[in-house]
């Protein structure tokens, strides 16, 4: 890549340890109608100044975040401490906390935007597609010690994209219609111009050059506006995994965070040992994303650059076995083992369809079931 001017440089904060942080997006639903409620501003105001609770694009959403944690159990306890008081306030106002990749029947046209310049600019630019972002997810940050590691790890992590999406898929419905997808959120979010799969850069300098070009051409004003499914967070010194659909409960959340933590640390340690990390062509990753979004746990995924294929759940078994020693060192062995519970009991998209069938298609029952899964 040609040399860039000095202002292309992006500082990376460097995390001395592979710490984790979790961002968990929740929707507010009316306790009676089970439709979305645009009351996040009032809820956040009542909670008061709290670095663990944030506003988001839409006024039906609150985001609960953990602090910087060393282990998955620590992160889950951190989230619990925030969720308990927050849910009491939400319930006192006649609402419930709800989390899935999408709401089963809400209409995007009735949702109000949060009053903030960056959100106004996003909608001004993206228009109809931006207004349709009625979606919720889970973001997991893992600390990386050097910018030189970020791009190789990010590129290799794409091999596990379908595993994480299939396990977390929780958005089969859109405005009352069964889309036929396990994760309609994955298909929706990539419509934003800076979202979707990341480019497979191998060096930090390539990423710096990309951001320079994006800023020079007016596509972004800040690096945070790069909304890839996996992206660096330079100011935090982390790699941020944004693949997962919204998760309704702490048990599955802990499992998915543990899987993410172990995958990143495993790749980091392999880099330290001068191993060459596995990669695949971008067209394989594009297909894997679509297959996982469409078929969920029934997806047959592409495994490697030689185009070998396998059922995602079969490959997941091998991944979990390989990561067991890593999980023990990271003190999340139980949480990693719980990943296997998701295929065993059914992923969220499967549970949602089951509930709808049992209630003659009444999607309010689906909301009830998802709300009930949040045990704090």
Swiss-Prot record:
The record's annotation in SUPFAM superfamilies points to:
Glutamine synthetase/guanido kinase (SSF55931)
- Keywords recorded for this protein, A-Z: ATP-binding, Ligase, Nucleotide-binding
| Molecular function GO labels | ATP binding; glutamate-cysteine ligase activity
- What is a single Pfam family found in this protein's UniProt entry? GCS2
Q: Which InterPro entries match?
A: GCL_type2/YbdK_subfam, GCS2, Gln_synth/guanido_kin_cat_dom, YbdK
Keyword Nucleotide-binding recorded: yes
Give the enzyme's main class according to its UniProt record, as a single word.
Answer: ligase
Source organism, top-level taxon: Bacteria
EC numbers: 6.3.2.2
Which GO BP terms apply? modified amino acid biosynthetic process
**Catalyzed reaction equations:** L-cysteine + L-glutamate + ATP = gamma-L-glutamyl-L-cysteine + ADP + phosphate + H(+)
The entry sums up its family as follows:
Belongs to the glutamate--cysteine ligase type 2 family. YbdK subfamily.
Q: What does this protein do?
A: ATP-dependent carboxylate-amine ligase which exhibits weak glutamate--cysteine ligase activity.
- What name goes with this protein? Putative glutamate--cysteine ligase 2
